[in-house]
């Protein structure tokens, strides 16, 4: 998932992985906080 800001990742991460938390690192979303 491409991103510029960490908040760009929140919806896609939740939608695709169910993970509630996300960070944008090197223009790529890192999803975490998954159960």
UniProtKB/Swiss-Prot annotation:
It holds the Pfam family Toxin_2. Transmembrane segments: none annotated. One of its GO terms (molecular function) is toxin activity. The record marks 23 as: Basic residue of the functional dyad. Disulfide bonds join 3-24, 9-29, 13-31, 19-34. It comes from the Eukaryota. Keywords: Disulfide bond, Ion channel impairing toxin, Neurotoxin, Potassium channel impairing toxin, Secreted, Toxin, Voltage-gated potassium channel impairing toxin. Its main location: secreted. Has the structural arrangement of an alpha-helix connected to antiparallel beta-sheets by disulfide bonds (CS-alpha/beta). Gene3D superfamilies: Knottin, scorpion toxin-like. It is found in: Secreted. Belongs to the short scorpion toxin superfamily. Potassium channel inhibitor family. Alpha-KTx 06 subfamily. Blocks voltage-gated potassium channels rKv1.1/KCNA1 (IC(50)=13 nM), rKv1.2/KCNA2 (IC(50)=16 nM) and rKv1.3/KCNA3 (IC(50)=2 nM). Expressed by the venom gland. The record marks 32 as: Aromatic residue of the functional dyad. InterPro entries: Scorpion_toxin-like_sf (IPR036574), Scorpion_toxinS_K_inh (IPR001947). GO terms for biological process: envenomation resulting in negative regulation of voltage-gated potassium channel activity in another organism. PROSITE patterns: SCORP_SHORT_TOXIN (PS01138). This is Potassium channel toxin alpha-KTx 6.15. GO terms for cellular component: extracellular region.
């Amino acid at each position: 998932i491409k991103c510029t800001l960490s908040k760009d990742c929140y919806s896609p991460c939740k939608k695709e992985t169910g993970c509630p938390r996300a960070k944008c690192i090197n223009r790529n979303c890192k999803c975490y906080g998954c159960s």
